[in-house]
């Protein structure tokens, strides 16, 4: 969607950094050069979607399984712009299951810890991230303090990253609806 439109504007930039192998393939198929983050100059902006967005521009991302790389690229970017349809906006995060990327050997340990936090983790079987890890989708987790919960989950041994984007929230959110677009 966005990448399809981006090909019409590729004359305005030199290259792109992709946050997933799938995005990299799409960019390349549109004739856009993809460079590794390690070889990239400072990144002016990162544009991506979200699974949930609260009024403070804190997000849940990772439904596609690329949350770790998305966090890295967002952290490396001067500005993080989130575009989504208005159905993704919620008052409180947690309706969408929270993706947690884990090292394969730690899946059960991490799952037990997530249960202690009040969640119901479900292993996303037959799925491997671009980093060779697994995803636990955590249902029913009460997300009162997204920033605190993001840190708490990241501190569990074996967790690579989780899909709460509170420490690096979006700078700009653009929501589309049948009535037009609005910015948060």
Question: What positions do the PLM features span?
Answer:
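A short, structure-level motif marking secondary-structure boundaries and short turns
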Residues: 7-10, 95-96
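N-terminal active-site wall of soluble small-molecule enzyme domains
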Residues: 1-6
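Short active-site oxyanion
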Residues: 10-16, 58
């Amino acid at each position: 969607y966005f990448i399809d439109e981006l090909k019409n504007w590729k004359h305005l930039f030199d290259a792109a950094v992709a946050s997933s192998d799938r995005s990299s393939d799409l960019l390349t198929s549109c004739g856009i050069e993809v460079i590794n983050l390690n070889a990239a100059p400072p990144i002016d902006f990162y544009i991506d979607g979200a699974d949930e967005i609260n009024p403070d521009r804190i997000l849940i991302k990772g439904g596609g399984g690329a949350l770790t790389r998305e966090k890295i690229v967002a952290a490396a970017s001067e500005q993080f712009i989130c575009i989504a349809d208005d159905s993704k906006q919620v008052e409180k995060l947690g309706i969408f299951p929270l993706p947690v990327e884990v090292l394969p050997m730690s899946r059960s340990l991490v799952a037990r810890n997530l249960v202690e936090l009040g969640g119901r983790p479900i292993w996303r079987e037959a799925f491997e991230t671009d980093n060779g890890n697994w995803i636990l989708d955590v249902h029913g987790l009460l997300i009162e303090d997204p920033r605190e919960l993001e840190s708490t989950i990241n501190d569990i041994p074996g967790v690579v990253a989780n899909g709460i984007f509170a420490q690096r929230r979006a700078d700009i959110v653009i929501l589309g609806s049948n009535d037009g677009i609005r910015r948060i």
